[in-house]
Amino acid sequence: MKQRDHLQRRLAQSQPMIRWVEQQVSARKLPSMLAFLPLIESSYRLDVVSTAGAAGPWQLMPDTATRFSIPMMPSFDGRYSLPLATDAALSYLSWLHQFFGQDWLLALAAYNAGEGRVLKAVLNAGTRNLWELQLPTETRLYVARFIALAQLLDRAEQHQLTLPPWQAGENIQVAMHPGSCSLLQWAMTKGVAMNEASRWNPAWQLPDAPGITNCPIVYSRGGSPAPTHQNSKAVFRKAVSLESLHDPLLLQAARGLDMSRGKIKLDALQDPLGLDTRRPPLLP
């Protein structure tokens, strides 16, 4: 199964970032599963941009970045910064959640299609049931893929999915660099090779970013200690506890989750992560 192999690779390769983002999600008391949304958006790659202009791990459009005060300059594009993009994306998702009456399905749809389009669809349809709204197929499948991902993670054994130990991979930290944002200066001060510094910080289009101050710099603190004998799957599942999602993403009987009425059934989705679906390519 190509999708399963791809997901396993991306989970393993993205584990350091997933752990860090989950901490930010938890600090905001948001559903833990949101830490995996960049898997749908960008396969958790920091350095990608779509032909539509969305960039970074959270695929933020320029207007959204501006709205949440992310700097975008020739020398520095904060949409590629894991800390800056995560802060903006979670702020946006939190706002959407409140705007749509604490409905996560509508919030996710609006993250993909824009709140204006989703609000118009709700008003026109006279219902908040996502699957009854006139929305682009891409948006409906976007939400369905996220629900499918939640199910895949929750039922890994059933789908022959091998989950990596939660503490696998490198440990990343974020340091605030006071004053002018010079990745080169930081790397020289810390004795870090520039290519290693750039690997975690693709927001820097140039080694220095004049006009940008107090920027977050991501760095690796090396690998994790050897895993204990504790069941790694249990550790992973606990860390992304789907219980925190309540009804919105568990496909239990709840308002707005009658997917059959919207003629979208997860069982019929042969490509839950959208790997074979035509959409704007991600460019390095």
What would you call each of these model-derived segments?
Residues 16, 32, 59-63, 67, ...:
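Generic alpha-helical secondary structure signal
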Residues 31-38, 55, 103-109:
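Alpha-helical scaffolds flanking conserved acidic
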Residues 47-69:
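Short, surface-exposed glycine/acidic/tryptophan-bearing loops
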Residues 1-23, 27-28, 72-75, 79-99, ...:
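Extracytoplasmic and endomembrane cell-envelope/extracellular-matrix remodeling and assembly machinery
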